[in-house]
Amino acid sequence: MAQEFTFTVNGVERTTTENKPLLRYLRDDLNIHSAKDGCSEGACGTCTIHVDGAAVKACVLTTALAAGRNIVTVEGLPEDVREAFVYAFGAVGAVQCGFCIPGMVMAGAALIAEDPEPTEEQIKYAIRGNVCRCTGYKKIIEGISLAAAVLRGEKQIDEDLERGDDYGVGKRAFRIDVRKKVLGEGKYPDDIDELDQPGLTYASAVRSKYPRARVLSIDTSKAEALPGVVGILRAEDVPVNQVGHLIQDWDVMIAQGDITRCVGDAIVLVVAEDEATLEKAKKLVKIDYEPLEPVRNIVEARAEDAPRLHDSFFAFGNTVELKDNVCQSRHVTRGDAAKALAESAFTVTQRFTTPFTEHAFLEPECAVAFPYKNGVKVQSTDQGAYDTRKECAHMFGWDNEPERVVVETMLVGGGFGGKEDVSVQHLAALAAYKLQRPVKCKLTRAESLAFHPKRHAMDGTFTLGCDAEGNFTGLDCEINFDTGAYASLCGPVLERACTHAVGPYKYQNTDIRGFGYYTNNPPAGAFRGFGVCQSEFALESLIDLLAEKVGLDSWEIRYRNAIEPGEVLPNGQIADCSTALKETLLEVKDAYYAHPGHAGIACAMKNAGVGVGLPDAGRCKIRIEDGRAVVYAATSDIGQGCNTVFLQDVAEACGLPLSCIANGECSTENAPDSGTTSGSRQTVVTGEAVRGAAFLLRDAMFGIEAGKPAPAAPVSAHGDGAKIEYDDGRAYQLRSQELIAGQGMHPQDPAAAIKALEGCEFSYVYLEPTDKLGADVPNPKSHICYGFATHVVILDDNGRVSEVYAAHDSGKVVNPISIQGQIEGGVLMGMGYALTEDWPLKDCVPQARYGTLGLFRAPEIPDIHAIYVEKDELLPVAYGGKGIGEIATIPTAPAVQNAYRAFDGKLRPDLPMVDTPYSRARHRG
């Protein structure tokens, strides 16, 4: 007789005869999804639950060990505790992507039950085993403290805050997704189960063990004979076997006889009725390889006798033949850098290297696909629904009918650029269409670490010059990126690294050469900062070296060269009226000078929007459904809060309370394409489209109050940031003050007016032109706008980071609750990049696990001061917002480097830095 294991889950006695991880029992048998599967190795804490009142990670506890225990998940917490955490986390801005949040709640609730008045240090210790990649922990610590105060009766829940009657731009907006994320009720793709999709099957790829090897034979016969196996797909089952975001060079599966390009290349896709059978079947697949010598790095890739990874690739409708391992190159010039540097009073030259780094988002990649109409529907976690549709349709050979693939973006548990490429979406779609069954395909944490694109490793040499007074004269540099086995977004990332290598300063002579090389390392692509973290680390470190030669301090040389409105950036673009770099420098001036020998400083700029002449439209449709304005824009909220921003835009334009506004499904079937969540673009680009649609709605509401009928047909218009037209060619008139938050005109009774517009639709497209890279115009407009920042890092007497002052010009602050957490999270990510994070490779094979990536934990965080600057004169689009997502990370690493140089006189040009207290701790770990 099988042994039985009995325990209590949320007050209900449960018995099972199967000994397996408790996390799997909770999720698979009981359909309790608040406990998340972030790593299944006890490293991340997303599965934290209570066992006899103590916070425990469910992935390391088995059902046998749980016997006789009392188990509680978020669903089983007392209602007053649940409500306290919903309010507290929403009020302080503790929720971003949300994947870590139920685990944080459980860790915090266990602490409060033990000590109702915990200190900050106690809270940090209680969540030491829980990773948050978004917030930098500070807001979570504040949230747990506030929840404790609410439960003690010292603080009251402000119900008005969540209700959102005053939800406009610049107001403290309770994020729209807080409640469902805190309580674990929101659905990420892995939370879709057999109750949602009857007959759900499970798919996973058998992946290459070698970075470069010829696949001699593939034998799937034993796996196919295993009961419960639904099907096994190979390269010959793929209509078009190469996909890619921009360049189609990424094999869906490696065919027999072909050569693998990196560890993790898919060779066969196994589909089974359940996950246990799936794992058994994968082990029965036999693949014979002929291992080949890999191309390990840039030096080997450049060698004359290096094996060529790709003979050609397909991009933008053309086949490109390759002569070597250069995937992409860029050359950005202005003025005469060689002459300027030769005539400079001072110059400095230095080589810098930065490593591959891992996004470490908490949610591993997952997608569910099922047959739908004459094609397939994919429910996924990614950063761009239409991009995923395009890649999947290309794989099927449906480039001319991409609508046969419908993509719905579910909740996304963090991205930071790492979910721009397809990972499992196309595999799930292929299996669902071929086998005519619903299919879930997800990556294990180990597969995710090995497979998805990383931040590019850089090897670059930079030369910067100035005159005798410290005014910059010119920059020359060569930037070399290791893009790994596939292009991913090598071209655009390399381009941003080159165009931003000049920094936010006022000089005009630059010569910047960039190269991205194919190697047999796992691919590199987009990562928060999009190439700028690498080049700005080099430039800002050089500036301190140059300042020393001139005899200026680090703050003064930056202030002397800082760009101001009306001045010309090194790329030729004229700085717009909202530019506030000098203001950010002034905000941190006192902190810098108060800590001589312990302070480092760095500045940065970062574009908003794709720019450089590429079409980058924001699109929005507002439809009135059940008396509410439902906002449809196929944009992915990966934690940055754009879905809340869009509702704030509507509230600001129309005067509506939150109860009359909602987000629609983010689906290619129902929502217009508003581009990828990348390039800090959503607040500006889609935000302006939402505002435009909201103005059309507001006009119709005015009409209702004036006794006019509701529009009989959809109302649509478009604008370019300077003028607006209805789609029938009529000009749209708008008073200039209405572009400023707080100065618009609203209907007298917005809630009543909107009810009379039931079923009406209002659409807007925003497309502001920019100039191509290298455009032959005196002052090319490369991007819609730029954000600016200055960070100061303070070291204590032991050389540890004690404080960070992060001053940001992000234009109009749309949601004050959200911006601080965005800045704090970006700063901590930048600190990790500088000091602790690494993703080591040995002969192209990844060596790290999630727990060894060097991520900062809560007890290690410094005091981060998030400062934002708002000028009186702002851009006219999107109420003046410019985005904060990427720039918060960029200046931190060079500020850390400059702090250490001030501290001990040593230059540390290679990341992660060595010879710091953090590097010693990392080596001990």
PLM regions with names:
Residues A149-L322:
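Flexible, low-hydrophobicity surface segments
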Residues V86, G108-I112, Y137-K138, S145-L146, ...:
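Short acidic, glycine/serine/threonine-rich loops at helix termini
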Residues I49, K180, G186, C366-P371, ...:
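Short beta-strand elements
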Residues G93, K171, D177-L183, E321-A367, ...:
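Glycine-rich loop/linker segments at domain edges
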Residues P307-F396, N561-R628, Q648, D771-P780, ...:
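Helix-loop-helix junctions that connect adjacent transmembrane helices in secondary transporters/permeases
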Residues M1-E162, V612:
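Signature of N-terminal electron-transfer/Fe-S-associated modules in redox systems
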